[in-house]
Design a protein with these regions (language model features):
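Short acidic (Asp/Glu) and glycine-rich catalytic loops that position anionic groups and cofactors
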Residues: 21-31, 64-67, 85-89, 96-103, ...
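C-terminal, non-catalytic macromolecule-binding modules
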Residues: 224, 229-308
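A conserved acidic, glycine/proline-rich C-terminal tail/linker
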Residues: 310-334, 338
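Extended, domain-scale alpha-helical bundle/helix-rich regions
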Residues: 94-196
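Auxiliary tRNA-acceptor-end handling modules of aminoacyl-tRNA synthetases
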Residues: 286-287, 301-304, 324, 333-339, ...
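Flexible, glycine-rich loop/tail regions that form catalytic "lids" or insertion modules at the edges
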Residues: 62-110, 132-134, 149, 261-263
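Zn2+-dependent metallopeptidase catalytic domains
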Residues: 80, 84-87, 95, 129-135, ...
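Active-site cores that bind ATP or allylic diphosphates and position pyrophosphate for catalysis
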Residues: 1-86, 144, 153, 160-161, ...
Length: 370
């Protein structure tokens, strides 16, 4: 009988939400109404209206009594789940839309390469509780790594390419080598990679004056080219600005992967692609959208723009990938060796490949932000 603060006693259905909630559940056959924790205080009114309906509608065919059950809302670190805040991100142009791979939306996660199985696996692991908490984003990333490790095709991609010349390898010669699509799947096929005199390696895999515990390519040191030969670095070439533009090495013909001599102890292994038949691709490296672990709480004192991670997207425009990736399709998943898990973006075209990083191979965020 308490009057509504605006309409007074004109309508006898106040509070409207509580009246409608239980009534619609009763008549529509809803047995369990699952709500988040803020609705717990509404449950007495929900029960009151349902019990009242059972009395005033004794002939109703329902042989059940709807129940309201509350559980915690899903909150992730470095993420905002509020639709109002997500809308603000879209409207202010901080993201490319609701399906931006940094958004915690279903379409955003799909575009980034998250599988339905990985999301369900994550939900199964965290369960639900009766108190509000915040789940570490690393758990979601672990779930997708675990799933993609089983299903992703392995391939090589060099994001920051530098030319490697094998000086004692015959010019014009090419070798075909077999590469397993997925070592985790005994039934998976293999694909061919071509080895030649000139390759591309990651620029960070070469250092001219390397520290003692640097096991990748440096003058005088041996390194294994994955699935190929052991090579010894002999030097490099620089441009007028002092930047390394070519690296030189000599290979040992007896160390082809699978031969007895290939078991020689070499501490460093790096990936590569052929300079002649690799294809160019754009690679989008996504990371956490916010720098604060709990942006919803931090947002009470800071503006949304102050909380954004300026490095949440880095675009690599001239990466080189294996030629079979030119036939990549949406809905397929790939592991770029030593780099991370990737999928083809809808922006991709036959003449301009675009790959999105789903997640890195390891959780580097905590290591960097310690």
């Amino acid at each position: 009988k308490v009057p509504h603060h605006r309409t007074g006693t004109k309508w006898g259905v106040y509070p409207m939400y509580d009246f409608a909630h239980g009534q619609s559940d009763f008549f529509e056959g809803v047995t369990h109404s699952i709500c988040t924790l803020e609705f717990e205080v509404h449950r007495p009114l929900y029960d009151y209206f349902v019990d009242l309906l059972k009395k005033v509608e004794p002939d109703h065919e329902a042989n059940y009594r709807p129940r309201q059950i509350e559980f915690n809302r899903l909150n992730l670190t470095y993420t905002m789940m509020s639709k109002r805040k997500l809308l603000q991100l879209v409207q202010e142009g901080h993201v490319a839309g609701w399906d931006d791979p940094r958004m915690p939306t279903v379409c955003g996660l799909r575009r980034r390469g998250y599988t339905p199985e990985s999301i369900r696996g994550f939900i199964d692991k965290i369960g639900y509780t009766k108190y509000d908490g915040i789940i570490d984003m690393a758990l979601l990333e672990h779930a997708v790594r675990e799933d993609l490790n089983r299903r992703a095709l392995r391939g090589s991609a060099v994001l920051d390419p530098i030319r490697l010349v094998i000086t004692n390898y015959p010019e014009g010669q090419t070798e075909e080598m077999s590469f397993l699509n997925n070592p985790e799947d005994p039934e998976s096929d293999s694909h061919i990679i071509r080895f030649s005199r000139e390759l591309f390696i990651e620029a960070e895999d070469f250092m001219e004056d390397a520290p003692k515990k640097y096991f990748r390519m440096t003058p005088g040191q041996e390194v294994r080219l994955k699935s190929a030969y052991i090579v010894r670095c002999t030097g490099c070439k620089k441009d007028a600005d002092g930047r390394v533009v070519e690296v030189y090495a000599e290979y040992d013909p007896e160390t082809l992967s699978g031969r007895p001599e290939s078991n020689r102890k070499v501490k460093g292994t790096i990936h590569w692609v052929s300079a002649t038949d690799s294809v160019e691709a754009e690679v989008r490296l996504y990371d956490r959208l916010f720098v604060d672990e709990n942006p919803a709480e931090a947002g009470k004192e800071k503006s949304l723009s102050e909380l954004l991670n300026p490095d949440s997207l880095r675009i690599v425009t001239h990466a080189r990938v294996e030629p079979f990736l030119a036939e990549a399709k949406q809905g397929e998943y790939y592991q770029f060796q030593r780099v991370g898990y990737f999928c083809l973006d809808p922006d991709s075209r036959p003449d301009h490949l675009v790959f999105n990083r789903t997640v890195s191979l390891k959780d580097t965020w905590k290591k960097v932000n310690k």
